């Protein structure tokens, strides 16, 4: 029976390309690391964390510490769209230490629109890094935008004529977001 168990363990090891480390071998006491919550805690299970940070924009998802260049969402099936996006990705300058994925919302966008989204996300990453440097661990450094900001980011486009927001607080949040993230589109 012991030999059979040894065989199973060897098979498991061959499935993984990389050596699997125990967390105690990788992270030392008092070491400060930047993580992102990828799944909230539920019941008895704690939150799932990742050191592979991703920041969603309107047309792309930026992966600031994953140097893989540009990718395309698997949900974009049309070969012509994929070819056009690949061409755009070859033309824009993606920092070498970063990667990005073009979202489905970016499938019919221009080079300038995708590049503008990239610049916005790079600025967000710079702010996140600055906040991390100036904070004392453990600390919340950045939080995904609330519903108003996410909706504006994902739904607002050149065809949007009016935005109706309920309440003064919601209006102020929407106004602030539009001024900061979409200044060209912003008018009272």
Name every feature range the model reports, one short phrase each.
Residues 1-186:
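Single-stranded RNA-binding surfaces
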């Amino acid at each position: 029976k012991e030999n059979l168990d040894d065989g199973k363990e060897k098979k498991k090891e061959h499935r993984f390309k990389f050596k699997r480390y125990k967390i105690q071998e990788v992270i030392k006491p008092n070491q400060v690391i930047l993580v992102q919550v990828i799944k909230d805690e539920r019941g008895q299970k704690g939150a799932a964390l990742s050191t592979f940070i991703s920041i969603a924009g309107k047309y792309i998802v930026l992966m600031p510490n994953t140097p893989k260049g540009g990718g395309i969402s698997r949900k974009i099936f049309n070969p012509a769209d994929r070819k056009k996006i690949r061409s755009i990705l070859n033309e824009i300058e993606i920092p070498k230490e970063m990667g990005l994925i073009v979202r489905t919302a970016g499938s019919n966008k221009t080079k300038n629109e995708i590049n503008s989204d990239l610049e916005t996300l790079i600025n967000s990453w710079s702010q996140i890094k600055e906040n991390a440097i100036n904070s004392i661990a453990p600390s919340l450094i950045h939080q995904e935008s609330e519903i108003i900001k996410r909706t504006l980011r994902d739904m607002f486009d050149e065809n949007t004529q009016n935005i109706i927001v309920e309440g003064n607080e919601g209006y102020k949040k929407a106004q602030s977001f539009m001024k900061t993230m979409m200044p060209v589109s912003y008018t009272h």
